[in-house]
Amino acid sequence: MKKIKYGIIGAGTMAREHILNISLIDNAEVVALADPHKDSLNQCKEILKTEVSYFTNHLEMIKENNVDVYLISTPNFTHIQILKDVIKTKKHILVEKPLCTNTKDCLEIKNLTKGYPSVFWLSLIHISEPTRPTP
């Protein structure tokens, strides 16, 4: 079975959690990581056990075009611009909550993803876990 290739944008605490969780899935792997802060990239390098491409700009990762899923785990205020860039790829997208920091930006993303040909998923803690009731 072909492995699902993840490109993670943002190398902070949540990205490290995602790296650990993705490593538990047999048919998934992190193949690319982008963050403007080299210290954050280095912390992720310590836990990644596979060959990964590292970038200091998410646009470089997009240009390489080597991922199946973009996972956006950056500071909240950066989501809108990164989403605009990643949506153009038509690849699968998982973005950490909140989607954006204001209603205007959320509505813009809603409009940009109407009819989106791939999965667009907003990560909401516990809502996607079958063992927890939906609030």
Regions found by a protein language model. Give the residues of each.
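N-terminal Rossmann-like dinucleotide-binding module
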Residues: 1-49
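Beta-loop-alpha module in the N-terminal Rossmann-like domain of NAD(P)-dependent dehydrogenases
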Residues: 18, 52-112
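Acidic-histidine catalytic/liganding microenvironments
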Residues: 25, 48, 64-65, 116
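Short, well-ordered coil/turn segments that N-cap beta-strands
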Residues: 28, 52, 91, 118-120
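Short, Asp-centered acidic motifs that coordinate Mg2+ and/or phosphate
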Residues: 32, 69, 119
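Conserved acidic E/D residue at the C-terminus of a beta-strand in Rossmann-like folds
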Residues: 34-35, 96-97, 129
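Rossmann-fold dehydrogenase core element
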Residues: 108-125
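Single conserved hydrophobic/aromatic residue that forms the stacking wall/gate
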Residues: 125-135
